[in-house]
Amino acid sequence: MMGTYVDLRIYDEGKEEVLDLAVERIEELENKLSMNDSNSEIFEINEKAGQSAVQVSEDVFPLIKKSAEYSETNKDGFDYTIGPIVNLWRIGYDDARKPSQEEIDKALPLVNEQNVELDADEQTVFLKKNDMRLDLGAIAKGYITDEAIKVFEENDVTTGSVDLGGNIVIRGNSPSRDEGGWNVGVQNPFTERGGIVGFLNLKDQSIVTSGIYERYLEEDGKQYHHLLSPETGYPFDNEIAGVTIISDYSTDGDALSTAVFALGLEGGLNYVNKEKGIEAIFVTKDKDIYTSDGVTDNFNLSDDEFNWINE
C-alpha cells in the first residue's frame, strides 16, 4: 500500500472494525492521488496538461489547494509542480539515474506553481503548460494519515495511532499509562526506518521526518537523495541529514519537513521558532542535533553517537 508500510493500531475494546474502515479510506485516497495509476485524478490532471481543466473530487481539491498554498509561501523548498524533475531522477525506482544538465534545464521552466489554475467553485485544476506534472509526494502521505486518524475520531476511538511510512499521528493517551502521552522515537537519518536518536512525549499530535536515509541514488561515488530543489533541479545540498516536524496535522508536518529541510539549519530553526504550532528537530551530517524552542524540554537523546546542541 502506497509503496510503503502501513501500521494502524487501536487500543479501545470492540473497535476492531474501525481498522478496516481506516484501511479502506487509505486505499480510496491512494487510488485518487497516485501519480502512476492511470485511473487516478492526479494522473488525469497531468495527462491533460496544456489542454484542459480537470474536475476533481472533494477529497482531492482541498489537498491540491493546500499544496498550492505551501508552494506559494515556501517557493525555494516546496513546489507541487516539481513532477518533471522527479520524473527525470526517478529516485526510488529501479531505473533511477542522474539526468544531464541539459535535461534539467529543459524541465525547470515547467516547475512553477503560478502556472496552475484552480477554480474552487467548479473544483477544477488546469496545468497551463504542456508536459507540466503535479507531484504530491511531499504532502500526500500526511494528508492520507490525517484522513485515517479522522476515521478513528468519527468512530469514537480514544486511543490509537496511524503510521504511514513514518508519517505518524498519535491519538489519546498512551495505552501503557492512564494519563500522559506516548513515547515516540525520532528517526535516525543515517539508518533505515525504525532507527532512532531519541524520544518525544506526544499526545494528539503528528510527527514526520524527511531525510537523506529514505531514498537515494548512488552514482560516480556520490549519493543523491530524493529531496529535490524546485530551484536547481538537484537534491538540496546543505548540512542537514534529517528534519523531524511536530505539528497538529500530518499534512502540515509532511509539507514542512521538506520545506524546512531546504532552508538549512539556521534558516530552518528561525522559520520554525517563528511559527505557531510547529516544532522541529534537526540532525546534521556531523551528527549534531538541534531542537526548536518549544520542544527542547520534551526531547530525550538516546544515542550517544549524537551530540545534542541544546542552546
Residue ranges and their predicted role:
Residues 1-311:
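Mature catalytic core of soluble alpha/beta enzymes
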